[in-house]
A protein has these predicted regions:
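Substrate-binding/gating loop at the entrance of the active-site cleft, primarily
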Residues: 128, 148-165
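Conserved N-terminal alpha-helix of the aminotransferase class I/II PLP-enzyme fold
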Residues: 78-128
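N-terminal "arm"/small-domain region of PLP-dependent enzymes with the aminotransferase-like
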Residues: 3-92
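Active-site PLP attachment segment
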Residues: 256-281
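Conserved PLP-anchoring active-site segment centered on the Schiff-base-forming lysine
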Residues: 136-155, 177, 181
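Conserved Walker B
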Residues: 97, 152, 208, 240-242
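Active-site phosphate-binding strand-loop segment of PLP-dependent enzymes
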Residues: 170, 174-237
Length: 281
C-alpha cells in the first residue's frame, strides 16, 4: 500500500473520530433551537454514526454509480458544450414549475425523443430518480387498488407508497416467484373489486437490485400475474435505475432487453448512473 493511500486512510479516520465528539453539553448557553439539534446529533455520535463528507480523491471508488465512467472521461463534457452551442436559445434556468412556465421547448423536444427511443407513449423528466419513484408510487395507485412489491424495493419507492391512496400494500419475498403467487392469490380472494377487474393490483419491482446484485425474474412474475388476473388489471412498475444505459437495445434497459415493454405499464430510469447526468424519468 502506498504512503499516499496510508496517509489518506489515517486522515479519514481522524476526520471520522473528530465528527463523533459530543457537543450537546457545551451548548448549555446556546439557543434551545441549536442545542436541541446538537443533542439529536449526539445520538448518532455516541454510536459512531456521524460521518463527515469526503471530497473526491485519487483512491479507487468501488461505490460509484458512474458505472460506465463517462463522468470522468471528459467526453460527456465535450458533448454537453457542443449541444449547448448548437442551441443558442437554450434557457438555463427553470423560471417556474412545469405547470406554470418552467417547461422549455428543448425539454419538451427531449421528452418526445426519449419516449420515441423507449418505444412508449410519453416520457416525463423530473429532477431526480428519488422524485420520479416517489411521484409514481404516490400518485398512480388509486383508492381501492392494491400495491404488491418486492420486499427489497428501494426506499424511494417505499417513500411514495407511504402517501399513496392505495392503503392495501403487501410485500413478497425478494425475487421469490412462488411467494409472489401466494400474495397475488391472497389479494384476489380478499379483494372482490380486484377479483372482478374493477380495481388494479400495482406490482413494484426493480430490474437490477444494486444492493444485492441480482436480477428480477420479471418474465415469470408477469406470466403469473396474467394468469391470476385475466382481466388485465395487474400492472407492473419497474425501477430501471441500475439497468438503464447498460443493457437493452441502445441502452434502453432490462425491460426492452427482455422484450417485455408491452407488458410493463411504467418504467422509471435515472440519468445519474450509467449516463453520468442528472434527473429521473
Amino acid at each position: 500500500m502506498s504512503d499516499a493511500t496510508t496517509d489518506l486512510g489515517a486522515q479519514w479516520r481522524e476526520e471520522w473520530a473528530g465528527a463523533q465528539k459530543i457537543k450537546g453539553p457545551s451548548m448549555k448557553n446556546s439557543s434551545v433551537f441549536y442545542r436541541n439539534i446538537e443533542e439529536e446529533l449526539d445520538m448518532s455520535r455516541k454510536s459512531g454514526l456521524c460521518f463527515p463528507i469526503h471530497l473526491p480523491s485519487h483512491v479507487s471508488d468501488f461505490s460509484t454509480c458512474d458505472v460506465l465512467g463517462m463522468g470522468h472521461t471528459g467526453a460527456l463534457r465535450e458533448e454537453f458544450l457542443k449541444e449547448l452551442d448548437a442551441n443558442p436559445g437554450f434557457y438555463m434556468g427553470a423560471g417556474g414549475s412545469r405547470l406554470l412556465d418552467g417547461t422549455t421547448e428543448y425539454q419538451d423536444s427531449f421528452e418526445k425523443e426519449l419516449a420515441k427511443l423507449m418505444g412508449v407513449e410519453s416520457a416525463l423528466v423530473v429532477h431526480s430518480g428519488y422524485t420520479a419513484n416517489q411521484a409514481i408510487f404516490s400518485t398512480v395507485p388509486r383508492s381501492g387498488d392494491v400495491l404488491v412489491y418486492d420486499e427489497l424495493m428501494h426506499a424511494t419507492a417505499l417513500s411514495g407508497m407511504k402517501i399513496s391512496l392505495a392503503l392495501d400494500q403487501r410485500p413478497f419475498r425478494h425475487n421469490d416467484v412462488e411467494h409472489f403467487i401466494e400474495v397475488m392469490e391472497a389479494v384476489k380472494e380478499s379483494t372482490p373489486l380486484v377479483k372482478a377487474g374493477k380495481r388494479c393490483v400495482i406490482v413494484g419491482v426493480e430490474s437490477y437490485y444494486s444492493m444485492d446484485g441480482d436480477i428480477c425474474p420479471l418474465r415469470e412474475l408477469i406470466e403469473a400475474a396474467k394468469e391470476i388476473f385475466p382481466h388485465g388489471n395487474a400492472q407492473f412498475i419497474v425501477d430501471e435505475a441500475h439497468s438503464f444505459g447498460v443493457c437493452g437495445p441502445e441502452g434502453t434497459g432490462f425491460v426492452r432487453e427482455q422484450g417485455l415493454n408491452d407488458e410493463v405499464a411504467i418504467t422509471m430510469a435515472t440519468f445519474t448512473k450509467a449516463l453520468s447526468g442528472a434527473g429521473g424519468e
